[in-house]
Amino acid sequence: MSSSDLLKGEFDGLNSEHFNMMQYLTQDTDEDDGSMVSPTSSADSMHQNLGVQQQQQQMLQAQQRQNQNGIFQPRRFPESPAMTDPCGNVSSSSSSSHHSDPMFSPNEFNGYAGANDNGNQTMNNIQSQQLSQQQHQQTRGGNLMMPQQSSIHAQMQNMNAPQFWSQPGTAAVNQPTNTLAQLNLFNIIRGGADSGMPSPVLEMPRKRSRLDTPCETPRIAPSFAGIDGFPDENYSQQQAIRFSKFQEEQWSPLYDINAQPLQQLQVHVVADKGFNYNSNDNCFVNQKKNHFQISVNVEASDTMPPKYVNFNNRLVPIRDFKLSFCGVKAEMPSSEITIRQSRADRKPHTHTPVLFEIQERRMTKVCVPRLHFSETTLNNQRKQKNRPNPEQKFFLLVVRLFASIDESEHGVLIQSYASEKVIVRATNPGSFEPQDTDIGWQRNGGALYTQGAVSVGTEHQVESAKLTVAGDIYMSGRIINPSDIRLKEAITERETAEAIENLLKLRVVDYRYKPEVADIWGLDEQQRHRTGLIAQELQAVLPDAVRDIGDYLTIDEGRVFYETVMATQQLCRMTGDLDSKIDEKVAEISRRLNEYAVRKKLASSMASNLNGDNKSLSYSRCSLTSTATNATSQPKRSRKHRAIKQAQSCGSRLSQGTVVTLVSIMAACLLAMSALYVLDWHNRNYGYHQHFETNTPSTKGELANLVISPANFMPSFQPDAPILLEKCFNPSCKTYCCTDTPPVVEDSRAIATHGLDNGDEVYPESPSNRTNGIARAPNLEHMAFETGVEIRIPALNVTLDQRYCVERSCNKRKGIFNVFVPVSRYMPDVALEIEIKAPISKVVSNCGAFPSTEFNHKVCPLSRTQQSESPVPTSTRLFDNIFELSMGSFIQSAYRFRVGYSTETCFSEDSNGSYEEYNLIFYRMCTLSSS
């Protein structure tokens, strides 16, 4: 008789109620003979406390129904740890015998407190632990303390809120955790006896006593937990294998005792251990020598238990339910792989289906340990470079629920579930592990990540770059960069004026990579041809757009892109300015055309009125003549016939002459208006050229520039332009560059030129204007050029603006400003400093004095610096915007300055609106008196 039969005979229906579970679990095997302790050996000692235990169970069950909501409890110790045999025999992966100490003891696992939501089963476990502690105390002491009972009862009633992350005591961990499992122990042993699973027989004494749990027998425990409250011991540590429905078309429905169809069973399969996910193979791996353990949770949600099953289109009574396991090939599900189960002697046997019961509105948990695949998958060996074999084969672990009937030996399939793809290997798992360099790669769901940098197609890593790719990148999406203002600081707007100049300096070229570079980078002939920029040239224009990564220079194309954006913005502003100017000109032309149309209409109406008066006059004459002839006699009509014809012909000639005269006058007026319009247009576009005569023929590029002969023209009078050093308040003031005799000074206080005749006041002497007796010009209200450019003479406190323009010599539309600066005879023959202020985005270029072909420079005849200086005027840059002009040594001299976005504007022939030209012409007033 087997050990299971002995246990079944001992635990009959009469003795099941006297079963002492705590004594059976805590008492060790006899060290001398190795015999098994009977679970009912001390059943008599339990009779005295049975009434108290039943009362406690009723109280706890009542509290269970009140606390049906899910409560978090500290994660319990795993039922079967990875390296410890929970059955008290041997380790699952160690070669030591069953006498060896465990890898780690439950007594040393007190700090384990991971959160796990077990649904309503949590309250059952807490209550079961407390009840088991009381029973253990009764067994050892023989009585139960009533104050402790009342204290526990009060604690259970006051438990209204969930408790999170509470630390369990050592006694609570070491005690059994399921009271309902104790109450159904007889069904467990009977199911184990039917399945042929013998109880363990301890052949040798142990080194020390430890907890005995008969795990070789499938554990069946009904639970009140819902379908979503299944505990997964490996959930927080590693990825768990999943099971899905399998061969659903072969399932058979269940019926109750009234032949009413029942709802489908809620089945949840959990692999407690034995399957590890391998990121390199992208699937789960099982070692053939290591067993795996499966827990199946079956819940029936109907009020009636299943009694019949549909078999061959008729209802057949169900004898019992079985749970079986098998493996199938992933590529051919019809090919089954046998599943074996190891027993206490570590010898594998063919797995026998496990019997279990299905109760109404209850959940049944079946735990089947020590399962093995009888075969390994094919093509497990690596091909090259430790990469997975492309011809790798896989298994599927199938869990089947059968209903045993009398008409079929194999039973009827109720439900079946298959796992994900599994690789079963028999060799050392370390041979399939990646190299040390690949340890940093991890998989989180469907994402593969690493903490370090990644290089694709190259062994070199660019400094501070997380990803380095040697080759092309194909992307169907977008590159998204975080640009939230909450992430940024020190935000400043860049000037867009220089962007156009920067883009004009860039050179876009077509090029090919060198053959040796193409060989290293793996580029074909088509990929060698590129269009882009040269890093060295870009570095000279935009230094922040080029980075040095060590061997070569790289270009930040994003920086170049934003430079083009700024240039586009500047072009839009310039286009807007041009549009506004064009609109102004169009409006002016429209106004003139309207005036011309009104004048033409007025002239036409006048001509039509004149023609109408002549016709009415002739008509009236004719009518009077006809009336007179009718009133006279017939003889007088023949006499006056000739006179009437002469009068009619005379009136017709008069009207024709009048019309011709008026038409001629209108034509002359039109010609005159056209000539005036053309002259006005010419005057507006070409300024003051009608006043000047050039010594040399002007070219196309010099049409609007100053090309004059001072001998033939000088401004006769500039009433709005202050003369430099116009007044002198010292009778002994010396004159320069003027050969004529100084005028006689009657008033000893002042010597003034023609400016005093216009009502200019003579300013009194002050410490600020008595330097050498020469007064500085007052700072009158000036008229700016409206371009942002300001020209000043700091030593004289004079600003050169539009007051110094002659007629239309300053043309803002063409960007040319010819400024005539009169200088008095009291100005010394020394150099003069001027200051030109331009906007931040523009640069002032010193183009020097006018060449002799464009301007006739006249040197002072009595200049003290004539022998040492050149007869050609000079313009020297002293500081950024301060220049020194040698105008004091000349009677007349001209200098050119250009303000633009580039420093090369002096070499440009045509401005095209890219710069503004300022021509400063200095002339002494003594030339007027001498001429």
Curated annotation (Swiss-Prot):
Biased composition (Polar residues): 37-52, 117-126
Alphabetical list of PROSITE patterns matching this protein: ICA, NDT80
Region (Disordered): 29-143
Cell cycle among keywords: no
Enzyme class at the top of the EC tree: hydrolase
Low complexity bias locations: 53-68, 127-138
GO molecular function: DNA-binding transcription factor activity; peptidase activity; sequence-specific DNA binding
Key words of the record: Activator, Autocatalytic cleavage, Cell membrane, Cytoplasm, Differentiation, DNA-binding, Endoplasmic reticulum, Glycoprotein, Hydrolase, Membrane, Nucleus, Protease, Transcription, Transcription regulation, Transmembrane, Transmembrane helix
Site (Cleavage): P482, S483
UniProt modification remark: Myelin regulatory factor: Follows autocatalytic cleavage via the peptidase S74 domain. Autoprocessing is apparently constitutive and is essential for transcriptional activity.
Keyword Transmembrane: yes
Enzyme Commission designation: 3.4.-.-
Cytoplasmic topological domain residue ranges: 1-658
InterPro entries the UniProt entry points to: MRF-like, MYRF_C2, MYRF_ICA, NDT80_DNA-bd_dom, p53-like_TF_DNA-bd_sf, S74_ICA, WH-like_DNA-bd_sf
Domain statement: Myelin regulatory factor: The peptidase S74 domain, also named Intramolecular Chaperone Auto-processed (ICA) domain or Intramolecular Chaperone Domain (ICD), has protease activity and mediates autocatalytic processing of the protein to generate the Myelin regulatory factor, N-terminal active transcription factor and the Myelin regulatory factor, C-terminal components.
Protein name per the record: Myelin regulatory factor homolog 1
Species annotation: Caenorhabditis elegans
Lineage: Eukaryota, Metazoa, Ecdysozoa, Nematoda, Chromadorea
